[in-house]
Amino acid sequence: SYFRLKETIESIFGMPYFLPTHQGRAAENVIFSALLKAGDIVPGNSHFDTTKGHIEFRRCHAVDCTIDDAADTQKELPFKGEMDIAKLEKLLRENPREKVPCVVLTITNNTAGGQPVSMRNIRETAEVCRRYGVPLLLDSARFAENAYFIKTREEGYADKTIKEIVREIYTYAD
């Protein structure tokens, strides 16, 4: 039932409001229909292909702010799907707030080969977004895998449960 779904979602993510959709593409369509207008700029860490398609369909600009190391297939890093905080901050500083309706952080970063994003990077991305008054949206298609990588690769999270890590992740989302 709807009420069991609501209870489960709130218990996992800590968020009381949600809109069920049958797939990620539909969710993107709903949210971008409400948030974007022609000419807007949507920064992110390598937008997934359907995400980029929904943004560009609305005559907006999907801007990649992924760390440069994500493109180096020979370099091994524990978190290679991260937002480049300096690139994001530069974009937000150089564009009017009304032209940037949101920032999209994809966890894990599918376009960069399913690379995870650290909790530190999620937190820093959220801090920058809040400083500029821009909502942070999480593309959460693979949130559980990302939480697992945080648990196994990031200092300070080995003793936390996946649920605790997920709850922390979503404290940074809008």
State where each predicted segment sits.
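Conserved PLP-enzyme active-site core in the AAT-like
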Residues: 4-174
